[in-house]
Amino acid sequence: MSKITLSSLKSSLQQGLKNGKNKLNQAGTTLKNGLTQTGHSLQNGAKKLILYIPQGYDSGQGNGIQDLVKAANDLGIEVWREERSNLDIAKTSFDTTQKILGFTDRGIVLFAPQLDNLLKKNPKIGNTLGSASSISQNIGKANTVLGGIQSILGSVLSGVNLNELLQNKDPNQLELAKAGLELTNELVGNIASSVQTVDAFAEQISKLGSHLQNVKGLGGLSNKLQNLPDLGKASLGLDIISGLLSGASAGLILADKKASTEKKAAAGVEFANQIIGNVTKAVSSYILAQRVASGLSSTGPVAALIASTVALAVSPLSFLNVADKFKQADLIKSYSERFQKLGYDGDRLLADFHRETGTIDASVTTINTALAAISGGVGAASAGSLVGAPVALLVAGVTGLITTILEYSKQAMFEHVANKVHDRIVEWEKKHNKNYFEQGYDSRHLADLQDNMKFLINLNKELQAERVVAITQQRWDNQIGDLAAISRRTDKISSGKAYVDAFEEGNTSPSIHPYSIDNKNGIINISNTNRKTQSVLFRTPLLTPGEENRERIQEGKNSYITKLHIQRVDSWTVTVGDASSSVDFTNVVQRIAVKFDDAGNIIESKDTKIIANLGAGNDNVFVGSSTTVIDGGDGHDRVHYSRGEYGALVIDATAETEKGSYSVKRYVGDSKALHETIATHQTNVGNREEKIEYRREDDRFHTGYTVTDSLKSVEEIIGSQFNDIFKGSQFDDVFHGGNGVDTIDGNDGDDHLFGGAGDDVIDGGNGNNFLVGGTGNDIISGGKDNDIYVHKTGDGNDSITDSGGQDKLAFSDVNLKDLTFKKVDSSLEIINQKGEKVRIGNWFLEDDLASTVANYKATNDRKIEEIIGKGGERITSEQVDKLIKEGNNQISAEALSKVVNDYNTSKDRQNVSNSLAKLISSVGSFTSSSDFRNNLGTYVPSSIDVSNNIQLARAA
């Protein structure tokens, strides 16, 4: 490269001005504006910048100090020649008098002796400044030095009110100002240790271009780099300015009045010493190593360029710009320690990735920031001499090119770090013969068990089961997803994993068990147990069965999406076994979203069936949101529809030919229910964007849908919170209306019908029926056979119609003598102490007709033959008729008490009385609408229990 003399430089500059006047004017305007802004910033922060020369100090002994004096005059920097005693405030307040910069009560002082010593210690600067024989050129070079210092101070101290600081000694302002001066002093020291010449920099740029000429997509860039103007030895060089600019990024923080104290301290003090020494070397070496690994050039000139550029880049701002990334890495690393102990180090890999890429990102980001701010460092030179013009051209022509190169290098370095993550995962999988991300889910599940062990162990007592079987769906994990995206192994990850664990009271860890769950084929087997009772609990929503496959597709230049394909299975088959089990399916996802409206509501969905084989035990099954097929097997089995808003029931067994078989239709109206949806996880690796589709449960609002359940070998059905319709079979049925206004028809058979809450209509039909209205004002019909009616306090006002048979009405929690019996029209009203009435319609109709119609012959028996109190005491229909007649349409309290006393003294009836007491107590303790969510083992009286007592009652 040819050398440039001062005269040739002037000639070249004149030609450049002639050929590119507009461009140079634009550059000059930018730089002058930068200088003006710098001056304003400095004036806002301090009274003035002063070059201090102690009285008696021989400036001639310095190497180039006279040039600095002339430059100070040229730049409007005041020169002091005073006694050192006037600087006491600087020494006492900041202890900076042994450094280049300090404070006085009149402004910021640049100490000439310290600067002179710096020039002596660093011959590069001294030799470059030269002697008095080339004073015109040296003034320009000195302008560059002082102009850079002036620029830094303008940024560093623009957030400080110096007048207030000096007058009030505000401690916060003092610390901030001290931090700024400490930083600037370190930066000037950095200049002395890293000065380079412009021609060396230009040579590095040119050679870098030659190394990049064969890189795909960068051919044009390499030509531009090699065709830069011949800059020669025009000045001290860009790297003096670059060294000064290492303070620019920190200045941005220090000058920001809104910045936190923590950030200002970090920018001004904590990192100031680090950026001068080992950090610069470490980051430079790291970036070079990454370039080698990425197949990029690392020759001497390129290494020198990187080292000199990183010297200005590794500033506090470079850390603060990516503080979140480093904090994230620290959090993930701390998080990873637990899972490493559980056999998964993916979180540590993720933390290392964020830390390494954070270092790269910090360096490159700050380099770009510093390059964009170079005009502040050369402002003085461009305004006062010819030296600034070629530097300005260099800034305008090269900054954008360097930025492009660095961005290209950054992505390559990111991908190299990602490749290391990829290789570690592949190496682990080869060694352990297992999917790495599945291991991640396994570790998450083990940690979950550890966190919830006390709760899970106590479930045995809460659910009254010898063994609790917990089925847990580990959901999509964002950190595992990030790792798959970074390593480009997105086709190997799954949406989660399901686990089966067993817990027994007294054990402090999950029990060894033979249970299994097969997601691909939709099989859950919990049948092999030697326990008498067990409770099956789906702890988290279980996704639908099927096998996932993924395909990674490139969407754009740097964007990829991994599409999810599912080979679905349309049902879960659950085998429970012979233990008496409680199984709750309400937390199983049975609906798959297919279509959405503009608001994101589900307007079309697909059904996933549950097929439950219960075995020989006495089982309780809670039905979920969609089609359920249940085979109860042997034992007394109950099916509950009492949880969730899963629609009103229409149960029809009128055509069934097998006992315990029912068809249950449900319309699940517009509401929220668990649906399986497809979501997208996004991760960015530099410029590379990765999207991964995965499944998740979503409690979405949906339009209505209809399902039909099929029940076999089921002894009891508990209804929903809606208005249900029950149509019984020709066999014995047990129905519980639950909440809502229910219509219950027992049809044939000896039925047990419970209305539950709400104003229900209950018809026992043919057979010997057991009828309980429950809360609400119910209408109850018993039919022609031997029926038992039950009422307790709080059940409301019930109307009973009976016709024939030997019937009984039991008040389960009221003594007979505390009731009031009245004739109202042709009906009998029985009133408890709360004022609730049980009205037996047409009780006296036949008698009234016989007394008013000649030769009338009774055709129907509309009376209930026995009315029973909570202690088993009773009154017969004949006694009621007699006492009502004697008491003028009401039984007196004395007459009723006598009936009770006479009954209690009858020894031959005592055993029967005890049996009836058990019957009434049993019925009184039962609430058909109870939600057994917290106690799946709660005792519910079965038809077998009740019928035994009914037979005793009838025998009486």
From Swiss-Prot:
Compartments it resides in: Secreted; Host cell membrane
PROSITE patterns reported for this sequence: HEMOLYSIN_CALCIUM (PS00330)
Main location: secreted
GO MF annotation list: calcium ion binding; channel activity; toxin activity
Organism: Actinobacillus suis
InterPro entries given in the database record: Hemolysn_Ca-bd, RTX_C, RTX_pore_form, RTX_toxin/Mannuronan_C5-epim, RTX_toxin_determinant-A, Serralysin-like_metalloprot_C
Membrane topology according to the record: Multi-pass membrane protein
Hemolysin-type calcium-binding repeats: 718-735, 736-753, 754-771, 772-789, 792-809
Keywords assigned: Calcium, Cytolysis, Hemolysis, Host cell membrane, Host membrane, Lipoprotein, Membrane, Myristate, Repeat, Secreted, Toxin, Transmembrane, Transmembrane helix, Virulence
Spans traversing the lipid bilayer: 238-254, 302-320, 383-406
UniProt GO BP: killing of cells of another organism
Name recorded for this polypeptide: Hemolysin
Gene name linked to the record: appA
GO cellular component terms given for this protein: extracellular region; host cell plasma membrane; membrane
Similarity annotation: Belongs to the RTX prokaryotic toxin (TC 1.C.11) family.
Name of one Pfam family that matches: HemolysinCabind
Domain remark text: The Gly-rich region is probably involved in binding calcium, which is required for target cell-binding or cytolytic activity.
Function: Bacterial hemolysins are exotoxins that attack host cell membranes and cause cell rupture by forming a pore.
Modification(s) after translation: Fatty acylated by LktC; the toxin only becomes active when modified.
